[in-house]
Amino acid sequence: MALSLESTTSFHMLTVSGSTVTELPGDSNVSLNSSWSGPTDPSSLKDLVATGVIGAVLSAMGVVGMVGNVYTLVVMCRFLRASASMYVYVVNLALADLLYLLSIPFIIATYVTKDWHFGDVGCRVLFSLDFLTMHASIFTLTIMSSERYAAVLRPLDTVQRSKGYRKLLVLGTWLLALLLTLPMMLAIQLVRRGSKSLCLPAWGPRAHRTYLTLLFGTSIVGPGLVIGLLYVRLARAYWLSQQASFKQTRRLPNPRVLYLILGIVLLFWACFLPFWLWQLLAQYHEAMPLTPETARIVNYLTTCLTYGNSCINPFLYTLLTKNYREYLRGRQRSLGSSCHSPGSPGSFLPSRVHLQQDSGRSLSSSSQQATETLMLSPVPRNGALL
C-alpha cells in the first residue's frame, strides 16, 4: 500500500511497501512504536485534520480514477476485435490502474482507525498489490514503446505479430510482475503488538532494504533506460524522416501517438519516483533530519502522487486512443491513394503491402493491423532510418 504510517521518532524506519514501522534500538525484531499511537493522541488536532484531508483527497481520487478507468475499459471493449496492438495494451494499463485504486478504501480505513482490520490475507494481498500493478504498468509501457519503435523502424516485423501474440506479452508482464512481488507476498504477515495489529515482513531490515532496492531497479531504473534508449533512437529516426519527407512530399509526419505514450511514461515516473526516493531514503538513512510533521506531509504528498497517476491516466488513455484511431484512418486513406499512384513518392508504403501479399498473407482480414505498423512517413530509399 502506498500510504505509510510514518514514525514520530528518530528510530530507523523499516518500510513495508508504503507502510512504515519502527525498529527500536537493541531489538532485532520490528516492534510497534508511535507510528500507530502518536496520531491517536487527543491533543493532536493537526493529525486529525490531516487524516481527514488525506481521506477526502484519496476518496475523490478513487472515485474519479475508478470511473475513468471503467469508462476506458468499456470503450476499449468496442475495439478489442481489431488487430491493433494499442487497444490490448490500453486495456491492460486501465486494469492495473483500477486494481491499484481498489486499495484506497483499505488505506483510508487503516489510517482513520490506526489499526489493521483485514487479517493476514489482507496483509499479503494489499501490501503486494502496489508492487504488482506498478510493475505491470511500467512493463506494459515499455512494450508499447518498443512496439512504436518497431512500427517506425521495422514495420514488416510488427505486421507479423498477431493480437494473440500481444495478449501473451501482456500475460507475461503480469507473470513477471507477480514473480517480483511474490517475496513480499510470502514474507509479510500479521503481527499483534499490544492492542494493535500490524503487517510486518518476516525478514530483517537488511533483506528488506535489498528487496526494495531490487524493485526500484526493476520498476524505475531498468525500464527507464530501455524506454530512454528507444525514444532517443526514435527522435533520431523522426528527424531524418522529416528531412526526407519534406523534400519528397512537403508533409511532415505526425508523431502524436508517440508523444502521448511518452507522456504516460513521464507521468508514471513523476508520480512514482518521489515515492521510491522517500522509501529508499528511509532505508539508507537511519536518522533523517525531519520533524514528524514534515515526514507526515512528505508521506501524504508521495501517497497522493502515486494514486494521482492512476487518476489522471484515463484522460491520457482517451487522448491516446482518439489519436491512434485518427492515425489508423489516415494511414488507410494514404494506402488507398498510394495504390493508385505507384510512381508517387509515397509508393514505398504499398510496396510493403505487396510484399505481404506475395508471401501468401491476406491483408483483407487484417488491414488495420497492416496500416497500424507501417511507417508514419515515407522512408528514404537509401535506408537511412534502418
From Swiss-Prot:
One of its GO terms (cellular component) is early endosome. It holds the Pfam family 7tm_1. Keywords: Cell membrane, Disulfide bond, G-protein coupled receptor, Glycoprotein, Membrane, Receptor, Transducer, Transmembrane, Transmembrane helix. CDD domains: 7tmA_UII-R. Disulfide bonds join C123-C199. It is found in: Cell membrane. Residues 1-54, 114-124, 187-209, 285-299 are extracellular. The chain crosses the membrane at residues 55-77, 88-113, 125-146, 168-186, 210-232, 259-284, 300-321. It comes from the Eukaryota. Glycans are attached at N29, N33. Preferentially expressed in neural and sensory tissues. High affinity receptor for urotensin-2 and urotensin-2B. The activity of this receptor is mediated by a G-protein that activate a phosphatidylinositol-calcium second messenger system. This is Urotensin-2 receptor.
